[in-house]
């Protein structure tokens, strides 16, 4: 894997609050190597470690994107949801930003059936086929469509398991992470000071509560994916 320069600036990370961890009482001792100090009851993340692992993650996604690989971005908490959908759309990635349905990856055959149902209902909705049904039947199907749109809308074009999964907030998305580990899917995870850094393939120590921090990390990863995709198109 070729190492590239991703312009990861420490001052920019500080302005985004990437270095602010959780309160010192809420910490995982395994995060000690990634913490540089304590300040006013909170842990301060060592940004040189953040820059190193973020750069490694950018190299990985660039390399994967340049070979036409598929990505899934997962971030379901309120602060991350909009950022995740925007980032994924920009980089042409799949995403889950509302709720992780248990077995979404490990029980892929069931997810595929749900996706087929969703696509069928979407076609009916577009062609106004639902309006030709009796009102009660149409109402039931519209509710089904709305439910599927909420939870599967971000993966509607996914035809198989993703090659790499990017996780925003390891604690919140633990089920998704465990499914990836079970299936051997490589993971990149944003981890705060209350997380276990040994679970994901690449763990990026960073504030997972501040919108500016999440945006900073996602922007770098998305830029690397887009650059990789451009390289793939040029070499095709």
Swiss-Prot record:
Keyword Ribosomal protein: yes
A single MF term (Gene Ontology): structural constituent of ribosome
Ribonucleoprotein recorded as keyword: yes
Membrane-spanning parts: none
Major site of localization recorded for this protein: plastid
PROSITE patterns, alphabetized: RIBOSOMAL_S2_1, RIBOSOMAL_S2_2
Domain of life, per lineage: Eukaryota
A GO cellular component annotation in the UniProt record: chloroplast
Cellular compartment(s): Plastid, Chloroplast
SUPFAM superfamilies (alphabetical): Ribosomal protein S2 (SSF52313)
Gene Ontology terms: biological process: translation
Keywords noted in UniProt: Chloroplast, Plastid, Ribonucleoprotein, Ribosomal protein
Family matches, as CDD domains: RPS2
Family: Belongs to the universal ribosomal protein uS2 family.
Xref: NCBIfam families: rpsB_bact (TIGR01011)
Alphabetized HAMAP family for the sequence: Ribosomal_uS2_B
PANTHER family in alphabetical order: 30S RIBOSOMAL PROTEIN S2 PROKARYOTIC AND ORGANELLAR, SMALL RIBOSOMAL SUBUNIT PROTEIN US2M
Protein name per Swiss-Prot or TrEMBL: Small ribosomal subunit protein uS2c
Organism: Aethionema grandiflorum
Gene name tied to this protein: rps2
């Amino acid at each position: 894997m070729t190492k590239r320069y991703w312009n990861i600036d420490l001052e920019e990370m500080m302005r985004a609050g990437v270095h602010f961890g959780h309160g010192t009482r809420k910490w995982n001792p395994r995060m000690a190597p990634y913490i540089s100090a304590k300040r006013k009851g909170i842990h301060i993340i060592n940004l040189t470690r953040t820059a190193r692992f973020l750069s490694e993650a950018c190299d990985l996604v660039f390399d994967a994107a340049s070979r036409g690989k598929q990505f899934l971005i997962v971030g379901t908490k309120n602060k991350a949801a909009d950022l995740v959908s925007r980032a994924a759309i920009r980089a042409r990635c799949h995403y889950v930003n509302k709720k992780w349905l248990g077995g979404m990856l490990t029980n892929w055959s069931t997810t595929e059936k749900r996706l087929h149902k969703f696509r069928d209902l979407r076609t009916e909705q577009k062609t106004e086929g639902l309006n030709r049904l009796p009102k009660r039947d149409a109402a039931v199907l519209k509710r089904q469509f709305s439910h599927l749109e909420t939870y599967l809308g971000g993966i509607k074009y996914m035809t198989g398991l993703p090659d790499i999964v990017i996780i925003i907030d390891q604690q919140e998305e633990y089920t998704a992470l465990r499914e990836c580990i079970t299936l051997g899917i490589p993971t990149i995870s944003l981890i705060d000071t209350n997380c276990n850094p040994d679970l994901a393939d690449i763990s990026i120590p960073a504030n997972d509560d501040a919108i500016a921090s999440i945006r900073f990390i996602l922007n770098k990863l998305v830029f690397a994916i887009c650059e990789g995709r451009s390289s793939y198109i040029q070499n095709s």
